[in-house]
Amino acid sequence: MDYSYLNSYDSCVAAMEASAYGDFGACSQPGGFQYSPLRPAFPAAGPPCPALGSSNCALGALRDHQPAPYSAVPYKFFPEPSGLHEKRKQRRIRTTFTSAQLKELERVFAETHYPDIYTREELALKIDLTEARVQVWFQNRRAKFRKQERAATAKGAAGATGAKKGEARCSSEDDDSKESTCSHTPDSTASLPPPPPAPSLASPLLSPSPLPAALGSGPGPQPLKGALWAGVAGGGGGGPGTGAAELLKAWQPAEPGPGPFSGVLSSFHRKPGPALKTNLF
């Protein structure tokens, strides 16, 4: 074999420095080297170059034999995150129970809320379900039962509280109604009309002139006026009651007739003593 080209290293380096990567046209390879990542790692060699005496041809051959990066990496080498999302989106199909299955499940649940494995397997074979589905149904049914119990307890407590509040409100209303009834009940004494004031005889009896003028229409003992007033002033020889009685008898007309003070004189004639005593003295 010919190893003479090994001694031409110095000349090749000198030629490379002189050309400064100038022209690769001297090489028998196709003109213009183009890099492509899809090129095979070891492309087929072109026509053989002459011995490495030519520096341009040797440099082109070295660059042509470099492997392309990622040329052997297959497409979609790394897994995409969409695959994980697809797995997460997979959901179990919801089990639909028939009326016969629900009837059997409710019957067993009424007997026990926590059936053992044997009871669940027997029930699953009977209603054509898996034991896992039966177990999940009992778990959901127990949760629903507890929720119903809590709701019933809360409703009962609310009803008891409302009843207590209603009783307290009724008692307060009863008290208020009693107070209002007592306050608005009319008093028996207040409902009665006030008694008429007792007529005072001091002014008509002690004044000598107005009384005869008022009684002038009817007959009266006019000649005895001075004697009667003198008897009243002096006591009439007896007590004050005797003088008052004599006065009334003297002033009473001989024949009954209508007069303005006939009713008053008749009432005082029935009760002559205390009233005249209080009014006159």
UniProtKB/Swiss-Prot annotation:
CDD domains: homeodomain. Transmembrane segments: none annotated. Residues 145-219 are annotated as: Disordered. One of its GO terms (biological process) is noradrenergic neuron differentiation. Residues 180-189 have a biased composition (Polar residues). Gene3D superfamilies: Homeodomain-like. Residues 153-163, 200-216 have a biased composition (Low complexity). SMART domains: HOX (SM00389). It comes from the Eukaryota. It is found in: Nucleus. GO terms for molecular function: DNA-binding transcription activator activity, RNA polymerase II-specific; DNA-binding transcription factor activity, RNA polymerase II-specific; RNA polymerase II cis-regulatory region sequence-specific DNA binding; RNA polymerase II transcription regulatory region sequence-specific DNA binding; sequence-specific double-stranded DNA binding. May be involved in regulating the specificity of expression of the catecholamine biosynthetic genes. Acts as a transcription activator/factor. Could maintain the noradrenergic phenotype. This is Paired mesoderm homeobox protein 2A. It comes from Rattus norvegicus. The lineage of its organism: Eukaryota, Metazoa, Chordata, Craniata, Vertebrata.
